[in-house]
């Protein structure tokens, strides 16, 4: 990507975030085009893409035959097909898997590094963008297209916007917002996704979890009414036979080091500590607080105490902005 990422600064929690423009270089874009693109994606992902309108974006999982996620995708309609956003670390292997059956269909599947991904969040984000676009997305219309630009709206953890655009528009937005907005890199958007409870699947955790272990059913990312797709049998079994015993949790507190994706944590059991869970992502905020997204058993006590392995500091459970009740 020729567009240069902004220099990093410590991320801030959504409640205190000033107006911020972010380069989302840790995320990546991919597309599918061609006459069979809808039918093809319908047979590959957990969401019902046939029901998707131009005004929607959806979270979906792309699974292996055992129902384990290669990746999760933020999907939207793009041209005569679809585009999706995923973590850059998993894009190449995910596209390799997606292309396996493409030879039999009229589709072209490709990485897209021509377009630039930007995020806008923080204080009065909507007002800042209102001067630059004739229409902004909202709850009723979550995707808006204008010229070379697609804008995606997110409600949680606080209103924010993801912008998919060309380099010229990205430069224009940066020039226009530079004076009033702080500039930051992907870590700030990652912190907001952790706060929102959107699962972050990086390479270390690809092929490890069924979608429900990362709360995808609570985020509208799984259709249990659609036809066949890869891994469907295992995903359905987890729902109808209660086979899933895991959930995605948000932890906050302090730690002397950030746990890495794929690492476990420790749970306090009386005087002892027991290893538990798998970290998906973690970020240290500017106030020193550490936030961790972790997959653990879904029956954790709300007052449980955790720590990064052998650390002197502790982490506790924070509420997510959605319910896991079926």
Curated annotation (Swiss-Prot):
GO terms for molecular function: folic acid binding. The keyword Kinase does not apply. GO terms for cellular component: cytoplasm. Keywords: Cytoplasm, Folate-binding, tRNA processing. Pfam families: GCV_T, YgfZ_barrel. Folate binds at residues 27, 189. It comes from the Bacteria. It is found in: Cytoplasm. InterPro entries: GCV_T_N (IPR006222), GcvT/YgfZ_C (IPR029043), tRNA-modifying_YgfZ (IPR023758), YgfZ/GcvT (IPR045179), YgfZ/GcvT_CS (IPR017703), YgfZ_barrel (IPR048451). One of its GO terms (biological process) is iron-sulfur cluster assembly. NCBIfam families: PRK09559.1 (NF007110), ygfZ_signature (TIGR03317). Folate-binding protein involved in regulating the level of ATP-DnaA and in the modification of some tRNAs. It is probably a key factor in regulatory networks that act via tRNA modification, such as initiation of chromosomal replication. Belongs to the tRNA-modifying YgfZ family. This is tRNA-modifying protein YgfZ. It comes from Shigella boydii serotype 4 (strain Sb227). The gene is ygfZ.
């Amino acid at each position: 990507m020729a567009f240069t990422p902004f220099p990093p600064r410590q991320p801030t929690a959504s409640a205190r975030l000033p107006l911020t423009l972010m380069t989302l270089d840790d995320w990546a874009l991919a597309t599918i085009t061609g006459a069979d693109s809808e039918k093809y994606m319908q047979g590959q992902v957990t969401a019902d893409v046939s029901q998707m309108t131009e005004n929607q974006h959806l979270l979906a999982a792309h699974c292996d035959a055992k129902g384990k996620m290669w990746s999760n995708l933020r999907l939207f309609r793009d041209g005569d097909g679809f585009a999706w956003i995923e973590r850059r670390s998993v894009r190449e292997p995910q596209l390799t898997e997606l292309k396996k059956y493409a030879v039999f269909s009229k589709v072209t599947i490709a990485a897209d590094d021509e377009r630039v991904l930007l995020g806008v969040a923080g204080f009065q984000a909507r007002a800042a963008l209102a001067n630059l676009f004739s229409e902004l997305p909202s709850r009723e219309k979550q995707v808006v297209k204008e010229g070379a630009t697609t804008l995606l709206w997110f409600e949680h953890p606080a209103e924010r916007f993801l912008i998919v655009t060309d380099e010229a528009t990205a430069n224009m937005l940066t020039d226009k917002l530079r004076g009033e907005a702080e500039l930051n890199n992907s870590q700030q958007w990652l912190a907001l996704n952790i706060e929102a409870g959107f699962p972050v699947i990086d390479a270390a955790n690809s092929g490890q979890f069924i979608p429900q272990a990362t709360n995808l059913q609570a985020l509208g990312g799984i259709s249990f009414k659609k036809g066949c797709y890869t891994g469907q049998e295992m995903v359905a079994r987890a729902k109808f036979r209660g086979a899933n015993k895991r959930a995605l949790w948000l932890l906050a507190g302090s730690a002397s080091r950030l746990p890495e994706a794929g690492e476990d944590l420790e749970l306090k059991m009386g005087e002892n500590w027991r290893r538990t869970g798998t970290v998906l992502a973690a970020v240290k905020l500017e106030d020193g607080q550490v936030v961790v997204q972790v997959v653990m058993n879904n029956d954790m006590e709300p007052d449980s105490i955790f720590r990064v392995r052998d650390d002197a500091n502790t982490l506790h459970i924070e509420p997510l902005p959605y319910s896991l009740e079926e």
